[in-house]
Amino acid sequence: MEDEMPKTLYVGNLSRDVTEALILQLFSQIGPCKNCKMIMDTAGNDPYCFVEFHEHRHAAAALAAMNGRKIMGKEVKVNWATTPSSQKKDTSSSTVVSTQRSQDHFHVFVGDLSPEITTEDIKAAFAPFGRISDARVVKDMATGKSKGYGFVSFFNKWDAENAIQQMGGQWLGGRQIRTNWATRKPPAPKSTYESNTKQLSYDEVVSQSSPNNCTVYCGGVTSGLTEQLMRQTFSPFGQIMEIRVFPDKGYSFVRFSSHESAAHAIVSVNGTTIEGHVVKCYWGKETLDMINPVQQQNQIGYPPTYGQWGQWYGNAQQIGQYVPNGWQVPAYGVYGQPWSQQGFNQTQSSAPWMGPNYSVPPPQGQNGSMLPSQPAGYRVAGYETQ
């Protein structure tokens, strides 16, 4: 049993002045060390190392004693490491395990990757945290270039949690990476789903809308929809400026700080499962009102037609990429209702939401009646309502 117990530790967040000799000197005070291997990053990032003990009990004691201790002014991170030999043994002798369904494993999203980072790079970076069942950098199908994010899957949930906590903000290939739980796409059922849903590419999605559009529509979460759930789902893709959820309708809007972050979110989350529901993601429509608020009075209260939506995106046929047959898209007219959705306490119509520093009174209808207000910042592609 002793031979099967881990004896190797990962030691990270080291100062560049730390040497193998110093690490051995410190860790040998806890127990006899078999060897120490220092890994120096050629890109100039902080080094890390692996320390192997002769006995598991000494390794466990070193983990407890050294994790969080300052060495040359830096608080080091110590964890169990998966050595290359044990990694090879596990994968070669566990063909049944390797073919398990992906939902039996625990998946970590890795974002903000440098273009040169490969699958082998992220696998090597996350290997110290436990047994990895899969790792990949997502590439564009057309160009073969990295999309700037990837996934690492662990057999053990604790290993995945630890990797998320320890690796978030660490430098890899010249960039600080972001980590979070990944929302994985479920196996496609034997139905029309696969034929109706096209695998989206980043280059395709990013060009489908104006560079000023940073808003993602996410629909299909018919139960359990909350702002916290949406923030947890979309935060790995970039800074979120605003979230609006409509639990009774089953959809939400997420506004990012950049067009590129929103595009990454659409590509990654579209078709995934959230709270047991397969969701659809595509661009929420931002109107020209946000650029030229003077024209606000002429557009409030009138939903865009199907043709207008297609003209905005340049080609109405592209709608099928985001709205497959049978998917019910909320019409713009839903915003004519008083704000009573989650996050809004008003029960009567109020001034339309124009974004920061904008506010205009609702327009006058016939006989002095007030037309329902609508948020000019958000507009969903949809059909005319009666």
UniProtKB/Swiss-Prot annotation:
GO cellular component: cytoplasm; cytoplasmic stress granule; cytosol; nuclear stress granule; nucleoplasm; nucleus; ribonucleoprotein complex
Location (main, coarse): nucleus
Modified residues (N-acetylmethionine): 1
Domain of life, per lineage: Eukaryota
UniProt-annotated location(s): Nucleus; Cytoplasm; Cytoplasm, Stress granule
Gene3D superfamilies: 3.30.70.330
Keywords: Acetylation, Apoptosis, Cytoplasm, mRNA processing, mRNA splicing, Nucleus, Repeat, RNA-binding
Domain RRM: 7-83, 106-184, 214-286
Modifications the protein undergoes after translation, according to the UniProt entry: Phosphorylatedby FASTK; phosphorylation occurs after FAS ligation in FAS-mediated apoptosis and before DNA fragmentation.
An annotated Gene Ontology molecular function: mRNA 3'-UTR binding
InterPro entries (UniProt xref): Nucleotide-bd_a/b_plait_sf (IPR012677), RBD_domain_sf (IPR035979), RRM_dom (IPR000504), RRM_dom_euk (IPR003954), TIA-1_RRM1 (IPR034827), TIA1_RRM2 (IPR034830), TIAR_RRM3 (IPR034496)
Gene Ontology biological process terms from the UniProt entry: apoptotic process; mRNA processing; negative regulation of cytokine production; negative regulation of translation; positive regulation of epithelial cell apoptotic process; protein localization to cytoplasmic stress granule; regulation of alternative mRNA splicing, via spliceosome; RNA splicing
Pfam families cross-referenced by the UniProt entry: RRM_1 (PF00076)
Disruption phenotype: 50% lethality between embryonic day 16.5 and 3 weeks of age. Surviving mice appear normal and live for around 2 years. Increased production of TNF in macrophages after stimulation with lipopolysaccharides (LPS). Increased susceptibility to LPS-induced endotoxic shock.
Region feature (Disordered): 355-376
Keyword Repeat appears in the UniProt entry: yes
Quaternary context: Homooligomer; homooligomerization is induced by Zn(2+). Interacts with FASTK; the interactions leads to its phosphorylation. Interacts (via RRM1 and the C-terminal glutamine-rich (Q) sequence) with SNRPC/U1-C (via N-terminus); thereby facilitating spliceosomal U1 snRNP recruitment to 5' splice sites.
Domain description: The RNA recognition motif domains RRM 2 and RRM 3 are necessary and sufficient for binding to uridine-rich target pre-mRNA.
Purpose of the protein: RNA-binding protein involved in the regulation of alternative pre-RNA splicing and mRNA translation by binding to uridine-rich (U-rich) RNA sequences. Binds to U-rich sequences immediately downstream from a 5' splice sites in a uridine-rich small nuclear ribonucleoprotein (U snRNP)-dependent fashion, thereby modulating alternative pre-RNA splicing. Preferably binds to the U-rich IAS1 sequence in a U1 snRNP-dependent manner; this binding is optimal if a 5' splice site is adjacent to IAS1.
PANTHER family: EUKARYOTIC TRANSLATION INITIATION FACTOR 3 SUBUNIT G
Protein name: Cytotoxic granule associated RNA binding protein TIA1
Classification lineage: Eukaryota, Metazoa, Chordata, Craniata, Vertebrata
